[in-house]
């Protein structure tokens, strides 16, 4: 459970592929070891509906190359949900393993994040990445993902505190909680601060309710949750650490600590909020939704749609491959009806489950973990990453298991589990081999495997899973000439839907000019100028004197 969050392994053109494969590897290992069961019919129907919409969108659009990875992610979530349903029905050890794994991942990442904050990670070498001093992100390489892991760990720590009867273990909650709050400060994540507020206030309300209903003679040891004031103390502790961490980093310079802009409190000042580009981002996405409200732009097409659209107002200034809000993302790529069906169905399931009436510690932990991920999903896209898919799927299964039926023969069930695990191992092995192969073109020639040092691009054609990365490499490495203009124009037009960045746009414009498609070249140049004005100006300065005027 902990390894996908902790692994430092990255490489190749897509930074999250190895993390995704390791998450699937955890799913395969858990299938071979832990009991499983089917989730509820409603949950199965929801995952099936999502898969159907993605398939239909890919069939009628240009997202076919994204279809297999997306279906793989949905299959991973569904398999994790089966494991979670097994926990709910049989109360096996996986629920305990989920909490322990998150505790291990979160506490180790918190220590690593603080080391990164103070810029003292050189001794770890390749075991970690090194962000700019004054920021921590563990091995997740993104502050908000790091903050969400820390928040998940806080929920797991609360479960550990609630289910343990050992006074010594209960006393560890306070220092562990302090470390986790410090790590949230080091992340500088506003998402993490929002999650901390919700966790502190929500659990304080639960602790107050627990004490109100307890007998008068009950003592502190009789309560599962810490006292409400202790839980709420996490909020002023965050504020204090927001000043203390930069104060220590500056060697005791109070002025530097006050002026430090790396923390969340500074970023919540009015001047910071008015320049926040997420508002512009969502406004752009709403514009795109209004243009194609029924069927959307197609799965994986947001980045192209954003580049190709000339907005009447402010424009989000970089490549936009996610709406940073899950309902909006579903609406812009799959259409409003699909988004309403998927999100509305999920909200109906949550309402029917009545989480506010929950008492079982395992289910409460699952609700807390699910809530942390969903809060992040309203601001970014954690469900595009394997470790969060794994936790999300387990929580879905724990909260919505199928009704218990007559037990099946244990031998048949174990055989099915081993067969499913073996299937996952084959899929992971093929994907790892194919990705390693495709990654060779992104390495210097001397660093490539010997079989791929010559004619590398030709040997990479035909990849099932990573053809977009191969096409991108070909476009960016191949010069446009009159002889290959038609091929490069078709290829650049295809890659533009994968990554509409200046290097690709330039090849599309140059090939269109060589083919005599001046009007098309002018149209793409105008979009280039609006989307990337600095890169467009540099390109114009470097164009030959005899190049067509744009």
Predicted ranges, named:
Residues 186, 207-273, 281, 287-288, ...:
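A membrane-periplasm/extracellular boundary helix in multi-pass inner-membrane enzymes
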Residues 195-203, 361-414:
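Transmembrane alpha-helices of multi-pass inner-membrane enzymes
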Residues 142, 279-320, 327, 334-340:
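TM-adjacent membrane-interface loops and short helices in multi-pass inner/ER membrane proteins
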């Amino acid at each position: 459970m902990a390894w996908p969050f902790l692994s430092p392994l990255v490489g190749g053109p897509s930074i999250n592929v190895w993390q995704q494969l390791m998450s699937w590897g955890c799913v395969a290992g858990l299938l071979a070891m832990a009991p499983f069961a089917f989730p509820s019919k409603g949950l199965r129907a929801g995952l099936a509906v999502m898969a159907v919409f993605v398939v239909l969108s890919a069939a009628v659009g240009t997202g076919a190359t994204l279809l297999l990875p997306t279906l793989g992610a949905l299959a991973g979530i569904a398999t994790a949900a089966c494991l979670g349903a097994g926990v709910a029905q049989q109360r096996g050890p996986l629920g305990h393993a989920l909490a322990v794994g998150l505790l291990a991942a979160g506490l180790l990442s918190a220590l690593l994040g603080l080391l990164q904050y103070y810029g003292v990670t050189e001794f770890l070498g390749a075991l970690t990445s090194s962000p700019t001093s004054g920021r921590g992100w563990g091995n997740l390489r993104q502050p908000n993902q790091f903050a969400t892991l820390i928040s998940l760990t806080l929920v797991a720590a609360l479960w550990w505190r609630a289910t343990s009867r050992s006074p010594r273990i209960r006393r560890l909650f306070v220092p562990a909680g302090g470390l986790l709050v410090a790590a949230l400060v080091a992340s500088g994540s506003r998402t993490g601060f929002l999650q901390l507020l919700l966790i502190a206030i929500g659990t304080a309300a639960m602790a107050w309710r627990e004490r109100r209903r307890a007998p008068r003679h009950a003592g502190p040891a009789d309560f599962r949750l810490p006292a409400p004031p202790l839980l709420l103390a996490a909020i002023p502790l965050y504020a204090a650490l927001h000043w203390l961490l930069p104060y220590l980093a500056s060697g005791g310079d109070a002025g530097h600590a006050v002026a430090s802009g790396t923390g969340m409190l500074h970023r919540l000042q009015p001047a910071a909020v008015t320049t926040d580009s997420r508002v512009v981002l969502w406004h752009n996405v709403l514009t795109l939704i209004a243009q194609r409200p029924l069927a959307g732009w197609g799965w994986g097409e947001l980045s192209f749609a954003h580049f190709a659209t000339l907005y009447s107002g402010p424009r989000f200034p970089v490549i936009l491959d996610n709406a940073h809000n899950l309902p909006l993302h579903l609406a812009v790529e799959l259409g409003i009806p699909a988004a309403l069906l998927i999100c509305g169905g999920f909200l109906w399931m949550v309402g029917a489950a009545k989480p506010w009436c929950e008492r079982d510690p395992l289910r409460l932990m699952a609700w807390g973990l699910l809530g942390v991920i969903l809060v992040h999903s309203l601001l970014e896209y954690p469900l595009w990453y394997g470790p969060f898919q794994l936790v999300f799927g387990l929580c879905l299964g724990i909260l919505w298991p199928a009704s218990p039926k007559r037990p099946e023969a244990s031998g048949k069930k174990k055989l099915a589990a081993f067969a499913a695990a073996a299937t996952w191992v084959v899929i992971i092995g093929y994907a790892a081999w194919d990705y390693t192969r495709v990654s060779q073109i992104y390495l210097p020639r001397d660093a490539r495997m010997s079989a791929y040092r010559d004619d590398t691009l030709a040997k990479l054609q035909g990849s099932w899973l990573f053809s977009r990365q191969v096409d991108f490499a070909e476009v960016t490495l191949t010069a446009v000439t009159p002889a290959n203009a038609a091929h490069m124009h078709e290829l650049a037009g295809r890659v533009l839907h994968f990554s509409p960045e200046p290097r690709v746009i330039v090849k599309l414009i140059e090939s269109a000019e060589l083919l005599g498609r001046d009007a098309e070249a002018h149209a793409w140049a105008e979009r280039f100028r609006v989307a990337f004005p600095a890169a467009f100006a540099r390109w114009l300065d470097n164009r030959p004197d005899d190049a067509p005027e744009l």
